[in-house]
């Protein structure tokens, strides 16, 4: 038996906004290799954001070859996904991509979002899908395409999400999972099925939409020509995978009831898993299906670590984040504030036109004060979402943290005190790619369910405790 254990490996593919990150995992949870490959983002007009699905596929294939170059490729048993949510990928009758994918952070659908929220109405949307319309969601993008690109819209035979395009190219299975589908505004989240009413509103049919699976379910095996190109067995199982946030939650063990995870990636999220389906009355948080078979609430900030990246790289012209943070000493006493709305905002303000602001500067404000304000501004933004969940009566005393921004000790300390939570730091912070590999392991039968593997793999190595004095200072500033 021990011999077999080494022979089982799964691959997690995290299809991100700036790069695809691939992770190779042994059954024990040991990470054997990680590879990242970038692809371009296109901004054809202000506020638009697009990518070419072919780029995702090409870089994922190259990435898998690189990832497995030093192992016996016959050991690869399963492939799972985490991926950027909400993006609209459309294929024609010959399976060609009709137009570049319109991404989650694309802001062109203001009118369509407004139409859904006012003409159809938030109450109806919430009743059909447990959510209201956000500019980033998929349904408004479909309406936009219908109105602005009718020729393209007529050609649409398949509508899918970004990671589902990879699953389709690898396995030939036209599928999605319920966690990712929750962000389309086409899913009846409570009952985990497509909403007939929403399809009608968007002028599409169920045939154009992928078959729904739970995240760990096997959707197919590798196409023979793909297996051959990669040097993998044709029996490699492809599982449905999950949206990036649900996949990251699996990767960090945020499964089961009342668990919390904060992700500091390009966007920032507060993710709370719950056995019970629930919706807050103002729809300030997303209410989605979770990858473990249950539900979750999620607040999403459109700019989180990207605020810090923009501040350091664009404005200060440096990539040395640690050096910029080093002089910051006094927490809770900063007179400079930053509103982190560089791309508009989702939770809980839902305003695509919101913009970033620095205020409170005086002649003695320093570079470090402004850097600190950026870090604090993001933490305050995340707290907005936490407060909504607390008002729903969900008890949250600690949170896990992951994402690029979580590498900064200072930022973790700020978050612990702004949110008054114990912040658990995990041994590995691989998030969605790890979650994808774990879902594949469950799909291949190596583990009985997602909760088991989630609890087993998430190892807390450090906890940042809030300091009551700082908590009080930040409370005042919040």
Residue positions per predicted region:
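Short, small-residue-biased leader/transition segments that mark boundaries at the very start
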Residues: 1-7
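N-terminal phosphate-binding loop and adjacent alpha-helix
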Residues: 35-74
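ATP-dependent carbohydrate kinase catalytic cores
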Residues: 137, 185-292, 303, 319, ...
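Active-site nucleophile and cofactor-binding loops and adjacent substrate-binding regions
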Residues: 29, 51-53, 77-83, 102-105, ...
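Gly/Ser/Thr-rich active-site cleft segment
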Residues: 17, 125-243, 308, 340-343, ...
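A polyampholytic, Gly/Pro-enriched intrinsically disordered region
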Residues: 56, 118-134, 231-233, 258-261, ...
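Glycine/Thr-rich phosphate-binding loops that ligate phosphate moieties of nucleotide
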Residues: 8-36, 43, 77-118, 151, ...
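Phosphate/pyrophosphate-binding loops at sites that engage ATP/ADP/AMP, CoA/4′-phosphopantetheine
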Residues: 60-77, 149-153, 196-206, 228-230, ...
């Amino acid at each position: 038996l021990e011999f077999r254990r080494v022979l089982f490996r799964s691959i997690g593919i995290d299809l991100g906004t700036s790069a695809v990150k691939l992770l190779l995992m042994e059954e024990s949870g040991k990470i054997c290799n990680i590879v990242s490959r970038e692809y371009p983002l296109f901004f054809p007009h202000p506020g638009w954001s697009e990518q070419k699905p072919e780029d995702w596929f090409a870089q994922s294939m190259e990435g898998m070859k690189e990832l497995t170059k030093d192992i016996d490729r016959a050991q690869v048993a399963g492939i799972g996904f985490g991926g950027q949510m909400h993006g609209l990928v459309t294929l024609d009758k010959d399976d060609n991509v009709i137009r570049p994918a319109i991404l989650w952070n694309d802001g062109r659908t203001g009118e369509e979002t407004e139409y859904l929220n006012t003409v159809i109405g938030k109450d109806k949307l919430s009743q059909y899908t447990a959510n209201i319309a956000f500019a980033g969601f998929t349904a408004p993008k479909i309406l936009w395409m219908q109105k602005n690109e009718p020729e393209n819209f007529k050609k649409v035979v398949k509508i899918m999400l970004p990671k589902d395009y990879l699953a389709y190219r690898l396995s030939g299975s036209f599928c999605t999972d319920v966690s990712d589908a929750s962000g389309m505004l086409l899913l009846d989240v409570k009952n985990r099925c497509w909403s007939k009413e929403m399809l009608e509103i968007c002028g599409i049919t169920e045939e154009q939409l992928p078959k729904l699976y739970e995240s760990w379910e096997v959707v197919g095996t590798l196409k023979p020509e793909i297996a051959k190109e990669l040097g993998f067995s044709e029996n490699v199982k492809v599982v449905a995978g999950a949206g990036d946030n649900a996949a990251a939650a699996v990767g960090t063990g945020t499964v089961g009831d009342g668990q919390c995870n904060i992700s500091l990636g390009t966007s920032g999220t507060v993710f709370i898993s719950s056995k019970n389906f629930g919706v807050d009355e103002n729809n300030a948080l997303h209410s989605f299906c979770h990858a473990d078979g249950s539900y979750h609430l999620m607040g999403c900030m459109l700019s989180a670590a990207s605020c810090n990246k923009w501040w350091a790289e664009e404005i200060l012209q440096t990539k040395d984040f640690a050096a910029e943070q080093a002089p910051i000493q006094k927490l809770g006493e900063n007179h400079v504030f930053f509103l982190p709305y560089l791309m508009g905002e989702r939770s809980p303000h839902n305003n695509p036109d919101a913009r970033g602001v620095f205020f409170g500067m005086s002649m003695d404000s320093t570079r470090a004060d402004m850097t600190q304000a950026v870090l604090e501004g993001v933490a305050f933004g995340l707290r907005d979402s936490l407060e909504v969940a607390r008002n729903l009566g969900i008890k949250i005393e600690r949170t896990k943290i992951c994402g690029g921004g979580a590498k900064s000790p200072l930022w973790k300390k700020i978050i612990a005190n702004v949110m008054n939570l114990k912040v658990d730091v995990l041994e590995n912070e691989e998030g969605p790619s790890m979650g994808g590999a774990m879902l594949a392991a469950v799909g291949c039968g190596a583990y009985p369910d997602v909760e088991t593997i989630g609890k087993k793999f998430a190892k807390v190595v450090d906890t940042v405790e809030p300091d009551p004095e700082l908590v009080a200072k930040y409370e005042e500033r919040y």
